Every structure is written in structure tokens, then in C-alpha cells.
């Protein structure tokens, strides 16, 4: 896979670029870009490094230094101390093909050695921009393969989660009158309320992790990166899911915040004591 690292900056830097700035592309991609985000932050990256590990999404000092140096070529003076988080992602880059075939990008189609399995691999630039069209193309392939009956009562829209930060005063007052939880701000950086978090959990295919809450509501995406709101989000998740706070995870397996033995209600209490451990 090809690994790319990004840096995300605080919203106070969002006005340093009015639109996406690309550098001259290379064989590895479009290079380091500088772009404002739809939420007002500034984003720089990615690097492009071929690695062997399929789960190698760690961030590195070398990657950060490379992004900082190359982003400065497009926008000088981006303050390093305004970086609020860094992250990395992987792209399934095609490096080897069967004998007689050359490497390519945008490999989309039914695998020759696995009938019914559709490959969508080698998504090079502009893979993100063409993702909606790719999805429609693959959907048509599946329809052709399976010949399914069209669901006549299918509803293609769903009610979104209210965004209190972007709502008008009248809309906020109405929501709070209906449910006071919309007036209880949990994430102060992004002004996300308890009502929004509850909606994210209770909706079909609701959130079960703090990252799930983050993706649905932006709670934890602000300057403090969940340093303030995370304990309360864990508490709300545990209460709604009917589990101990020690079972709540950030994302995947092994990402629990609390050690076993720190039961519900212990998040704000004194550190758990191992059996037989004396108080100092």
C-alpha cells in the first residue's frame, strides 16, 4: 500500500488559503496540498510512501517534517503550533500484475479467479473525486450480475442529526423546547450538544464508539481533540448502550479507555486500585 500522512490545523488558520492549492504532480501523486476544509480548518498533506504493512497508519516525525516543509512552498508561514492532530491513511497501490500484464490504476471489475468478487483497487488520483461515479458503476455491475428486484417502497433519504452550531436561534429554541438535551453542550470546541450525541447513538446503525460519535457529530474534532468532552461522551455511550464504561472503545479492538475493574461511574473517580495494592 501507499501511505499518506496529513496535518490538520486549528480553525484560526483556515483563512490562510481560499481554495485548494496543488503543487506540480509527480509519479507518486499530486504532492503536498494546502486546503481549507468545509468546517473552517486548514489541511496539509499527504506524503506518499510505499510500505509493506497493510495496517501501517502510524504517523511519524519524518512525515510531519516533510508535510511542514513542502506545504510552506505553497503557503509560507503556516504556524506549526496550530497543528491540532495528524493522521495517516493507506491506498491500495498496484505494484505487481500477473505475467504479461502491466501495472495500472483504477482496477475495477470481477476478479478472474473469484467469480462474484468485484475488485475496486488501485484508486489513484483523482480517486476521491470519482468515488460517487465509481459507486454507481459498481452498483450497475452488481445489478447485472444478480438481477435483483427493485424495492418499490425504498426511501433514499434519511433524517439527519440536527447541527446546533449552525442552527438559527429560532431553530435552537424549538429543539431545546422539544428536548432540553439539545441545550446541554458537551463538546465546547465544536459546540456539540448532548441531544446530537444521543441522536447519533439512537439512530439506525448508531454509533457504538467515540470515533463513531466524532464522525456523526464532530464531537472531539476541535482544538482540544476531545480532551474536554471525551469523558462525558464515554459516559453517555455506556449509559445508552447499557454497558460498563470500561467496555467503551475509541474505535477497533483493544482501544478501550479504561482498564478492567474501573466500573461504570468510575471515570471521574480516583484511579482504580489493583487487588492488594495499598494507598500511598
Where do the protein language model's features map onto the residues?
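Short cysteine clusters
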Residues: 187-189, 224, 229
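C-terminal catalytic lobe of FAD-dependent flavoproteins
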Residues: 3, 23-39, 50-185, 192-205, ...
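Low-complexity, small/polar and acidic-rich linker and loop segments
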Residues: 242-274
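Short flanking/linker segments adjacent to small metal-binding domains or redox-active Cys/His motifs
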Residues: 229-238, 265-280
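Short helix-loop capping/hinge motifs at secondary-structure junctions, enriched
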Residues: 13-18
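Iron-sulfur (Fe-S) cluster-binding segments and ferredoxin-like electron-carrier domains
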Residues: 55, 193-204, 227-245
